[in-house]
């Protein structure tokens, strides 16, 4: 994969979960992109037309196959994996990536909502955070993948080939957090975050560090995907 030859495909699954810092990073790096909403009834694009696919969060999970958009995303990410198009899965996107690779997605014993430190085996790629978590389900590390990060309650990141799946939201911004907190007041109260006010108060203080960590993660993903693609192309070119 050579950044800039093809655009990045961003799959957005609900209006309140936009690509946020991911788009900011792409613009800063000069990488073209297209945002495709999965709820507007349009046909899913061919992942082969893109340099990589980023799949964002969703109110649904991969097991909600009664939802046409979920089935469509499973097919699209499955096609990307089959065609060796790198996939960056963020929360729901990471769950879908795990599912198509043979992992399991299940209800988490407790939802993770808010800023959380994670245990990471590769801080150069995935810093310890804190990262913004907002999920009620969790994935397992699929067969053949390497678990990179975790909390006590969930696997937080895995990689396999050019693909990276994470359970947290590196793309989140203060504005995105405010939207989620307003919609999930009841869940936040159950977890001791009264009306989301604590979360809203602390998020601006972490904005700069979160942006730096997110850009490091995105850069590392792109570098690994690019190196793998170039090595594969070189190996193919050497065959007679």
Features from the language model and the residues they span:
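N-terminal beta1-alpha1 ligand-phosphate binding loop
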Residues: 8-26, 39
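Catalytic nucleophile loop
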Residues: 79-104
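Glycine/Thr-rich phosphate-binding loops of Rossmann-like dinucleotide-binding domains
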Residues: 18, 63-64, 98
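Residue-level signal for inorganic ion chemistry
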Residues: 26, 91, 221
């Amino acid at each position: 994969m050579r950044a800039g030859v093809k655009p990045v495909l961003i799959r957005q699954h609900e209006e309140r979960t936009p690509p946020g810092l991911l788009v900011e990073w792409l613009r800063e790096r000069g990488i073209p992109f297209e945002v495709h909403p999965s709820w507007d009834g349009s046909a899913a694009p061919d992942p082969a037309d893109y340099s990589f696919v980023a799949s964002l969060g969703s109110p649904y999970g991969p097991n909600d196959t009664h939802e046409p958009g979920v089935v469509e995303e499973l097919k699209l990410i499955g096609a990307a994996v089959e065609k060796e198009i790198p996939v960056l899965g963020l929360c729901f996107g990471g769950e879908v990536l795990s599912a198509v690779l043979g992992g399991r997605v299940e209800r988490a014993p407790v939802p993770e909502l808010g800023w959380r430190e994670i245990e990471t085996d590769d801080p150069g790629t995935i810093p310890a955070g804190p990262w913004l978590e907002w999920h009620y389900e969790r994935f397992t590390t699929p067969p053949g993948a390497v678990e990179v990060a975790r909390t006590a309650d969930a696997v937080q990141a895995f990689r396999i080939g050019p693909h990276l799946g994470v359970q947290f939201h590196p793309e989140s911004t203060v504005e995105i957090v405010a939207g989620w907190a307003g919609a999930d007041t009841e869940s936040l109260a159950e977890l001791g975050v009264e009306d989301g006010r604590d979360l809203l108060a602390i998020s601006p203080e972490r904005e700069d560090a979160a942006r730096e960590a997110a850009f490091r993660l995105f850069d590392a993903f792109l570098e690994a995907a690019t190196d793998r693609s170039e090595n594969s192309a070189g190996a193919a070119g050497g065959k007679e």
